[in-house]
């Protein structure tokens, strides 16, 4: 069984945590960016798996852990250090966070300088109007049905 471990870190502690994971042989899996619509801040989620430790755990009890580093409360203009010097495979994720969310990721090893995606609106994932938010919330509500189920099923 897979177990997920979430560790919240600050921007200042990100590189030291990544360096520690690299030191024990953890592999980078993915990075996910999202915007908090309530306060406008951003969150980054970095996922790693320590393959060596996972093999040992699976052999013992069938379990293994996915490790996640969570950086929350990021202001759009705050500088976020790239982890690409430790994990070069992060480059598409960091470029995506820059292009779609407008996040200021610094010192990327492979930096597309805003041209990783061709988008018609700059930073499209950072924009949400009150109308769009209301429409999303409305579409999430399930319609209620007053008709008894046996009539709907033809019983």
Task: Please tell me what each predicted stretch does.
Residues 1-155:
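Terminal low-complexity/charged segments
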